[in-house]
């Protein structure tokens, strides 16, 4: 496994791989890797000849400086995990390598609508930062396929739209959520939880599943369903942040024509903002 820190060296290797006709897969990450990331890597390995994993804590997608400062950086551990998975390349640049002129005045990619709705409404600039860095990685790595987790449902939808709108010839693979045995969705931010909070954390998935059962049974009293879910979260020790029930295919409000819904749930538990989602076929 080769660890690359410079754009120049990355381009040299990508040029060689292209000349050799290799099929390239990209797995973009911010590091602090867990089994959910390894699932992305496994999917990438099954889909291509060469796997490139990027590890970059992207300052453009953080709306709070304190959140950026405390985001875990575990490059050595991450590389050991990736080496065991027989990843070919790790691209781990510094912010100065990615943004030589700094982020102020940086050309950016914005996906209208999807960038500012739902999660984007509470995190201004976040999705613009995501689409900009992913677009930049696509240009540098020139992958045939890229793998993203379905846990970040809105992010995946945004990237699919960006790829379609910008004409990228890249297959986007969404990889299902990986959960701990107690149901908690794996996330780098779970590391912010204390031992006691970790015991409470699976309650998010339980509330999510209860909402899914109601929708599958044909209940369409969305305001009431959401109010009950918020109350249940707060009673369990969470601070409910945002619960949305949207059309799984458009992320717009449900209509009579909607066949599948996605439940998007976010709640604070101590210093950790936990997110989860579930797709459900709507009952009649």
Curated annotation (Swiss-Prot):
GO MF annotation, one: ATP binding
GO biological process terms held by the UniProt record: pantothenate biosynthetic process
EC number(s) given by UniProt: 6.3.2.1
Catalytic site: 37
Residues binding ATP, per UniProt: 30-37, 149-152, 178, 186-189
Keywords in alphabetical order: ATP-binding, Cytoplasm, Ligase, Nucleotide-binding, Pantothenate biosynthesis
GO cellular component: cytosol
Recorded superkingdom: Bacteria
Cell compartments where the protein resides: Cytoplasm
Chief location: cytoplasm
Enzyme class: ligase
Annotated metabolic or biological route of this protein: Cofactor biosynthesis; (R)-pantothenate biosynthesis; (R)-pantothenate from (R)-pantoate and beta-alanine: step 1/1
Entries under InterPro entries matching the protein: Pantoate_ligase, Pantoate_ligase_C, Rossmann-like_a/b/a_fold
Catalytic activity: (R)-pantoate + beta-alanine + ATP = (R)-pantothenate + AMP + diphosphate + H(+)
Keyword Manganese: no
SUPFAM superfamilies for the chain: Nucleotidylyl transferase
Keyword Cytoplasm among UniProt keywords: yes
Gene3D superfamilies hit by this protein: HUPs, Pantoate-beta-alanine ligase, C-terminal domain
Binding positions for beta-alanine per the UniProt entry: 61
Binding locations of (R)-pantoate: 61, 155
Described function: Catalyzes the condensation of pantoate with beta-alanine in an ATP-dependent reaction via a pantoyl-adenylate intermediate.
Protein family (similarity comment): Belongs to the pantothenate synthetase family.
The protein's assembly and partners: Homodimer.
Misc: The reaction proceeds by a bi uni uni bi ping pong mechanism.
Cross-referenced NCBIfam families: panC (TIGR00018)
Name of the molecule in the record: Pantothenate synthetase
Organism: Klebsiella pneumoniae (strain 342)
Organism lineage string: Bacteria, Pseudomonadati, Pseudomonadota, Gammaproteobacteria, Enterobacterales
